[in-house]
Amino acid sequence: MSIEVNNESGVEVDEAGLVALSRYIFEQLYIHPQAELSILLVDEPAMEKLHIELMDEPGATDVLSVPMDDLTPGTPDRPTPQGMLGDIAICPQVAQVQAKNAGHALQDEMLLLTTHGILHLLGYDHAEPEEKEEMFGLQRELLTGFTGKEAPAETTQ
């Protein structure tokens, strides 16, 4: 699997941890081993620009997902086909504020946002209460399994 992290944010982030988490999620959700994912870490002005371009909403946000191929979680007998999962843009500056407000470390927030972004790439959403329950439940399960501790509270905007 190809997972690339490009840090243009100016904030020091444990990029290896984000890659390890992504690999864990790919394995848990039976994503094809040749699937590709790009994680871009950007500063607030760059995130605001992306937020306007992609969502037509002003202001920086925490995470944006841009799916490429229409991939969904697989099963043990039928993994996801090979393809480009997509791109995730994360703003560590916004994540720092959210982590502080939630009372957990920046790395915990970065792991939360990475998981959240990957789930969006796989078609999960949280617009409706049932969708939110399913997505956030899976998000907590994946984070707890990866870190071995209780997942941080959801802080996504």
Curated annotation (Swiss-Prot):
Cofactor: Zn(2+)
GO cellular component terms, A-Z: cytoplasm
Location of this chain's protein in the cell: Cytoplasm
GO BP, one annotated term: rRNA processing
Entry note: cofactor: Binds 1 zinc ion.
Xref: SUPFAM superfamilies: Metalloproteases ('zincins'), catalytic domain (SSF55486)
Sample GO molecular function, one term: RNA endonuclease activity
EC number(s) from the headed UniProt entry: 3.1.-.-
Reported function: Single strand-specific metallo-endoribonuclease involved in late-stage 70S ribosome quality control and in maturation of the 3' terminus of the 16S rRNA.
Protein name: Endoribonuclease YbeY
